[in-house]
Amino acid sequence: MKTNKNIIVEGKHNKPILTDVFYLENKQPKPIVIFCHGYKGFKDWGAWNLMAETFAKAGFFFIKFNFSHNGGTIEEPIDFPDLEAFGNNNYSKELDDLGNVIDWISTNIDYQKEINLDD
């Protein structure tokens, strides 16, 4: 299984979106699952890596990410050092972040042979 962690996706609101991908590297197009964890958590919380690995082993291209205003930073992605960003977070920003992740994977040349954008 191929895992790329802490990929920085540029966000619309001047905050990076820290992203992980999990997949079986075999140059076969796979359906994409984008996991939006919610409840102001982190992409690395609890069993999320185990869940990502399970989806990847089942033949999916699995993406999980931290919302840009979840309170974490690139240097400290599993803590709350950026309380101002956390306080300014809202549903619209999270929808924008999801759109940025969709745009990023849809145009990322590195993964084009591994993802299915047609279905």
Regions found by a protein language model. Name each.
Residues 25-76, 80:
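Short, surface-exposed "cap/lid" segments of acyl-processing enzymes
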Residues 3-5, 9, 13, 43-62, ...:
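Generic detector of contiguous secondary-structure segments
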Residues 1-28:
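N-terminal cap/lid segment of alpha/beta-hydrolase-fold proteins
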Residues 84-118:
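Alpha/beta-hydrolase active-site loop
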